[in-house]
A protein has these predicted regions:
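Preferential activation on post-signal-peptide N-terminal prodomains/segments
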Residues: 2-149, 154-157, 163, 169, ...
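Compositionally biased, intrinsically disordered linkers/stalks adjacent to structured regions
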Residues: 201-225
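Helix-loop elements that line ligand-binding/catalytic pockets
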Residues: 168, 175-176
Length: 225
């Protein structure tokens, strides 16, 4: 295990890491992420067979998989903002729109879609944080992070499992708090590969993906055209 403590700048040092082109592509995204752009504190770098990990003294971390197929980022400073200043939970339509804006903007290099692919919003949830007094009694509970998860479809067929999702977390004020993406080479299940897409089969597939991820039938999904 190789360890070193990096001073500024962090990004160029990570970008020089050998390996598939995806690693450099993902590393370039660091410049767009709020806490990395601030370059506050120092970052400890760890290189091993599983990839690269940067952990900052300012409470943010980034990991990039060794094949460049997984990207994980979280800014704990934003996620742990003052509980008393938190806004209400983001509405689903706001969360989907915010996720689309980020994926089509700052994170566009991360999620590269082929012409026959689309992203589908499949579920949302909230990370809830509580405040307790010295006796341990719960004083208040608030939503710290709003999370929206997108899956990939190929020819309108949902691709389940690894290599097919992007999970974004936003503060109640709409700030990007976390990114968890697994975007490796995908495989369409053999049973689905040769199925002709019709309204009926699409309804069945939509039901299957809702069941797989626990998405209520009442939740409206959003497709990126």
């Amino acid at each position: 295990l190789f360890r070193s403590v990096l001073n500024q700048p962090v990004v160029p040092a990570l970008a020089r890491q050998r390996g598939p082109g995806n690693v450099a592509r993902l590393a370039a995204l660091l410049e767009t992420l709020p806490s990395v752009a601030r370059l506050e504190g120092t970052a400890e770098r760890r290189d091993d067979a599983e990839g690269i990990c940067l952990t900052s003294s300012d409470h943010w971390f980034v990991t990039v998989g060794s094949e460049g197929d997984h990207f994980d980022y979280r800014d704990d400073q934003l996620a742990n903002a003052s509980v008393w200043d938190q806004a209400p939970a983001m509405r689903l339509d706001e969360l989907v729109a915010q996720g689309k804006t980020v994926l089509e903007g700052a994170l566009a290099p991360l999620v590269v879609l082929e012409p026959n692919e689309k992203l589908v919003a499949i579920r949302s949830f909230q990370e809830v944080r509580g405040v307790r007094n010295n006796s341990g009694a719960l004083l208040a509970e608030t939503i710290a992070v709003n999370v929206i998860e997108f899956a990939r479809t190929v020819n309108d067929i949902p691709v389940l499992g690894h290599g097919s999702y992007v999970r974004l977390g936003f503060s109640p004020l709409g700030q990007l708090v976390s990114v968890d993406a697994d975007w490796s080479r995908y495989k369409v299940l053999p049973a689905q590969r040769f199925t002709v897409a019709t309204p009926q089969t699409m309804a069945v597939r939509e039901g299957a993906i809702r069941a797989q991820f626990g998405v209520p039938a009442s939740m409206v999904t959003s497709r990126f055209e």
